[in-house]
UniProtKB/Swiss-Prot annotation:
Protein's name in the database: Large ribosomal subunit protein uL2c
Lineage: Eukaryota, Viridiplantae, Streptophyta, Embryophyta, Tracheophyta
Species for this entry: Cryptomeria japonica
Tagged with keyword Plastid: yes
Main location: plastid
Keyword DNA-binding on entry: no
Length: 277
């Protein structure tokens, strides 16, 4: 994975840099593995009221159906055919042809190339891209696409460059260190994929212009200090005025820095040994 820097051919390419991958194949997605998606309201609820600010517009996308379960293809050898970009996520995806004739998309593990083979199941070897139950994975192994509930499919460590680490096993539970720094308990029967998610340098990209953000469906963010007093706690005043508060606040008057926003007494609290950093 490398980062491609653009020359200043136009103002839009000034300071522009994107992640590039020589092994990626520019191909149309599999038609049977794509579906249209209705992006409901772009941050609005069923009444048309904004519930999430700074969203709207964006390019139309086809949703790629990713196989996060991997359990339906136990002990069936699969071959990596293509490595493609997915506009719906930061990670690359791989098209896999299985020996039984079925084709699926999976997240691209770092280091996997076209022509490599993958396998799922309890007896799969500990190699890049293989999916196994946590009880069969050695301690210290880096993993991604980790299930939280058995059979539900991977939900943790799925973004570009994400990686979790198996650090302990005790009874029917295993202890994982997640990308956020959180340490939590997961059932030993949950599946995980060996290795790190590819496209590691995605976080180093520079979009360079406002239009690139609009293509992603992200609208401008207006600072509260330049609003009117009726619109934000930081607003109002003559000219460039300070916020007039002891500490920054959200548009709804809550503390903006350091206040915990996690729901109290959540069912998963018993599984978290150490909160994220």
């Amino acid at each position: 994975m490398n980062t491609r820097s653009y020359s200043t051919f136009t103002p839009g390419t000034r300071d522009k840099s994107l992640s590039s991958f020589d092994g990626k194949v520019k191909s149309h997605p599999q038609k049977k593995l794509t579906s249209g998606q209705h992006r409901c309201g772009k941050g609005r609820n069923n009444s048309g009221i904004i519930t999430i600010r700074h969203r709207g517009g964006g390019h139309k996308r086809l949703y790629r159906q990713i196989d996060f379960r991997r359990s339906e293809k136990n002990n069936i050898l699969g071959k990596i055919v293509t490595i493609e970009s997915d506009p719906n996520r930061s990670a690359y995806i791989c098209l896999v042809h299985y020996r039984d004739g079925q084709k699926t998309y999976i997240l691209h593990p770092r280091g996997i190339m076209i022509g490599d083979t993958i396998l799922s199941g309890p007896r799969a070897p500990i190699s890049m891209g293989n999916a196994l139950p946590l009880t069969n994975i050695p301690l210290g192994t880096t993993i991604h696409n980790v299930e939280v509930q058995v059979g539900k499919g991977g939900q943790l460590a799925r973004a570009a460059g994400a990686v979790a680490e198996l650090i302990a096993k005790e009874g029917r539970l295993t202890t994982l260190r997640l990308p956020s720094g959180e340490v939590r308990l997961i059932s030993e029967n949950c599946l995980a994929t060996i290795g790190q998610v590819g496209n590691v340098k995605w976080k180093n990209r520079t979009l360079s212009k406002a239009g690139s953000k609009r293509w992603l469906g992200k609208r401008p963010e207006v600072r509260g200090v330049v609003m009117n007093a009726v619109d934000h706690p930081h607003g109002g005043g003559e000219g460039r005025a300070p916020i007039g508060r002891k500490k920054p606040l959200t548009p709804w008057g809550y503390s903006a820095l350091g206040k915990k926003s996690r729901k109290r007494n959540k069912y998963s609290d018993v599984s978290i040994l150490r909160r994220r950093k």
